[in-house]
């Protein structure tokens, strides 16, 4: 956010804009996370049966802070914060963890960031639609028999165990 403001302001931020941005970032960083109903129950069921990795995008400090404060870190082997969730970064992630594309199963609510790139590299995906999706994340679902759509996150357990 600060980088974008610097670019828009020609490399120098007026003091009032700097403090306004700092206030927004602080509010975002300390905003209480709302864990979707059934997430912890699902993770508890899957833990021990699968290597669970969080793949998220955004600012490293902010995302790791959210991950740690969520109370869900105990269920995961690793948390990967990517600049973009695209084919290149998913391939780097699975190479780092010695996972073949066909062994990768991504569970997520964004077709653009979670589902399509994983399908494009040969993985599988479970789409968990959410009422709120950023406009820049909207895209049509790819045609693939490697995609499952569930209504509730707890439905995942029925497919995987």
Residues covered by each model-derived region:
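Charge-rich, low-complexity terminal tails
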Residues: 18-19, 27-34, 150-161
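Asp-based, Mg2+/Mn2+-dependent phosphohydrolase catalytic module
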Residues: 44, 60, 64-161
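Alpha-helical structural context
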Residues: 7-8, 49, 96
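Short, acidic loop-to-helix structural element flanking the phosphoryl-transfer center
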Residues: 16, 23-54, 87
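Acidic ATP/Mg2+-coordinating residue in the GHKL
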Residues: 57
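A metal-dependent, Asp-based hydrolase signature
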Residues: 1-27
């Amino acid at each position: 956010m600060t980088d974008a403001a610097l670019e828009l302001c020609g490399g120098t931020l007026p003091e009032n804009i700097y403090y306004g941005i700092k206030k927004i970032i602080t509010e975002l960083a300390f905003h209480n996370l709302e864990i979707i109903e059934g997430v912890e129950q699902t993770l508890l069921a899957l833990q021990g049966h699968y290597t669970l990795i969080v793949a998220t995008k955004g600012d490293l400090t902010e995302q790791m802070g959210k991950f740690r404060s969520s109370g869900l870190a105990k269920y995961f082997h690793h948390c990967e914060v990517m600049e973009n969730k695209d084919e290149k970064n998913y391939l780097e992630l699975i190479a780092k963890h010695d996972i073949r594309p066909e062994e990768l199963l991504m569970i997520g609510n964004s077709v653009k960031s979670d589902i399509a790139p994983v399908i494009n590299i040969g993985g599988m995906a479970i789409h968990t639609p959410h009422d709120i999706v950023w406009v820049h994340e909207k895209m049509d679902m790819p045609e693939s028999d490697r995609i499952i759509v569930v209504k509730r996150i707890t439905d995942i357990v029925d497919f995987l165990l």
